From Swiss-Prot:
InterPro entries for this protein: 4-PPantetheinyl_Trfase_dom (IPR008278), 4-PPantetheinyl_Trfase_dom_sf (IPR037143), ACPS (IPR002582), Ppantetheine-prot_Trfase_dom (IPR004568)
EC number: 2.7.8.7
Listed name of the protein: Holo-[acyl-carrier-protein] synthase
Subcellular location(s) per record: Cytoplasm
Keyword Cytoplasm: yes
Pfam families: ACPS (PF01648)
Uppermost EC category: transferase
Cofactor(s) listed in the protein's UniProt record: Mg(2+)
Length: 118
């Protein structure tokens, strides 16, 4: 049974402005593994990756119903499976989780569905 669904839409240029003012912003949002992937990319790809992880994590906290505050960005990790699809590899949710991240132009959208294991 679906117990939560969260959606987030983010402008990549807004993330770029924050990142330009404070490059440590990436360290606040990304886990160590996510940060290692981020640092392997050229600048423009870094921005879309960072915006995608931001949006995915925002969608997750909307789905679980806590918002950022009770959870931190470090409590949630989004990596890619062998096919390159994003997966939630770390979160406090014990059921099944499904994530989709899409980029189009200056926008990134993420959707997270949480499902009870029952």
């Amino acid at each position: 049974m679906i117990v939560g669904h969260g959606i987030d839409l983010q402008e990549i240029s807004a993330i770029e402005k924050v990142y330009q003012r404070n490059p440590r912003f990436a360290q606040k949002i990304l886990t160590e593994q996510e940060l290692a992937i981020f640092e392997s990319f050229p600048y423009k790809r870094r921005l879309s990756y960072l915006a995608g992880r931001w949006s995915g994590k925002e969608a997750f906290v909307k789905a679980i119903g806590t918002g950022i505050g009770r959870l931190t960005f470090q409590d949630i990790e989004i990596l890619n499976d062998v096919r390159g699809c994003p997966i939630l590899t770390k979160s406090p949710f014990k059921g099944n989780s499904f994530i989709s991240i899409s980029h189009s132009g200056n926008y990134v959208q993420a959707s997270v569905i949480l499902e009870d294991k029952k």
